[in-house]
Amino acid sequence: MKTIIVFLSLLVLATKFGDANEGVNQEQMKEVIQNEFREDFLNEMAPMSLLQQLEAIESTLLEKEADRNSRQKRCLGENVPCGDFPCCGKLACEKTFGYGWWYKSPFCVKPSKG
């Protein structure tokens, strides 16, 4: 019974002094919050706002994406039908006897010497 009375008295004392500490903590928290709002207000007055920074980052990302998606047109290799697309390097688009009569289109071949 004596131990229960001791624990109850400790509980009452802890709750009483705990509330006093909470009041001090709440005052400190209010000061911290006010200081943070002051810093945020000063940050809003900065020459480059957060929105401008995000727009700058977005524009650079869009430029990189546009560069990545734009490819050079590919050329056609040897013995490939060449109707609308160009042939690579030293190849010429000519009608040949081998494939041309079957597919009825010119092919990329090495130009004949002569």
Swiss-Prot record:
Residues 21-74 form a propeptide. GO terms for molecular function: sodium channel inhibitor activity; toxin activity. Keywords: Cleavage on pair of basic residues, Disulfide bond, Ion channel impairing toxin, Knottin, Secreted, Signal, Toxin. It comes from the Eukaryota. It is found in: Secreted. InterPro entries: Toxin_22. Its main location: secreted. Ion channel inhibitor. Belongs to the neurotoxin 14 (magi-1) family. 03 (ICK-30-40) subfamily. This is U17-barytoxin-Tl1d. It comes from Trittame loki (Brush-footed trapdoor spider).
